[in-house]
Amino acid sequence: MKYTALTLLIGFIYFQAVAQHSMQGYISDEKTGERLIGCSVHILGTTEGVTSNNYGFYSIKINKLPAWVVFSYIGYQTDTVEFVPAGNNIDVMLSQKTSNLKEVEIRATSAATSTPRTGVLTIPVQQIKQLPALGGEVDVMKAFQLMPGVQGGSEGTSGLYVRGGTPDQNLILLDDIPLYYVNHIGGFISVFDVNAINDIKLIKGGFPARYGGRLSSVVDIRMKTGNSSEIKGEYGIGLLASRIFIEGPVLKKEKTKFMFSLRRCNLDIATRLITRMQSGLVFSAGYTFYDLYSKITHEIDSDNSISFSFYNGRDNIFFKQRDPVAAGSDTFFDYQANIIWGNTLASVKWNHQYNKNVFGTLTFAYTHFKYLNRVQYEEKYKSDKEVIEKASTSFVSGVNDVILKKDFDYFVSNTISL
């Protein structure tokens, strides 16, 4: 035991001694200020490199000066920055790349970045938006069904069968918080609105310890934090659903920003109208769902930031009917049945950069899944609608999680991070 501890101590001192300088900071989108997750950072002319963490933070060790550090990210122009020892964070802004169809050059270059993790699949959100969609609704979960080692279930459904597992064996995380049953319409559409998502990755094997034990896979999804420079938004009305998305700064520019996204199914509008017309306004039935995302992020200073995330989604199958108790009777009864299910998530996070090598996140969160099967009956007078008799039956099932955790990212060297 003593020899093991001594070996670990010597190794720790070695890594600290070898790295004479350290360059750290945040990587963001130049136009929106959105943090770039998994951005490649490497020293020009060497094979040493790292990637930014889930909050866009990077830390790279530099052993020899002068040195130039290269930042590259899919869909963005590569940027090269000369390292100047200063001790402060060096934040980098990358601009999105425009497609120019010119000649193709093939050059041999040295391996430049850290070795990618085995079993981790990442698809840029912009590429997901270009995939074919069911009813105009792009589904981030279906995008992974096109990847090796992943299969879909029944035709058109969004469930993930990873290496022989089943969808219920996957851990689904939204901003590090678990969600349960993430499908609408019996599995044809997932609850994830692509407009509200910044980054998504699928881990098929070799799960890090922070995810716990899972049989199949881990789907790690990160919400957008919002545009830090200007208020922007978009809306759309589709065959299946309508949506609205707004993001921008609040209060002091670039310090506090927000993101809001709402998607609602349109099916119930048609079914309500058709069933009421056919029944003479005494019967209506249908199905609807909605997904609401919101997030507020405030940067306290260069080392601290706090954010609040919220998600609420519901599915509702409903049936309503009104009939007289008997022919010629002055009383009638109202009958209503609902099957409702969905998730609610709320979390508060505090991000703190302890030093040039250590980044920490404190999370307090609540997540809830609810399934409700309810039947209601009321007997009333036609004249004043006074309730004569009332009865209801409900079946409720759910899961509640209260989470308090502290995570650390320790950049030991350019090849080791904990």
What residue ranges belong to the model's regions?
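Structural signature of outer-membrane beta-barrel domains
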Residues: 111-113, 167, 179, 224, ...
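Transmembrane beta-barrel wall of Gram-negative outer-membrane proteins
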Residues: 238-264, 279-317, 341-366, 412-413
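Flexible loop and strand-edge segments within Gram-negative outer membrane beta-barrel domains
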Residues: 305-353, 368-398
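Short strand-turn segments of transmembrane beta-barrel domains in outer membranes
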Residues: 188-190, 198-208, 217-248, 260-264, ...
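Short, acidic, small-residue-rich periplasmic hinge/interaction motif at the N-terminus
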Residues: 28-32, 39-44, 68, 72-76, ...
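Periplasmic N-terminal accessory/gating domains of Gram-negative outer-membrane beta-barrel systems
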Residues: 77, 111-168, 174-207, 224-225, ...
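Membrane-embedded beta-strand positions in outer-membrane beta-barrel channels/transporters
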Residues: 91, 141, 159, 199, ...
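Short, acidic Ser/Thr/Gly-rich low-complexity loop/linker segments typical of extracellular
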Residues: 47-57
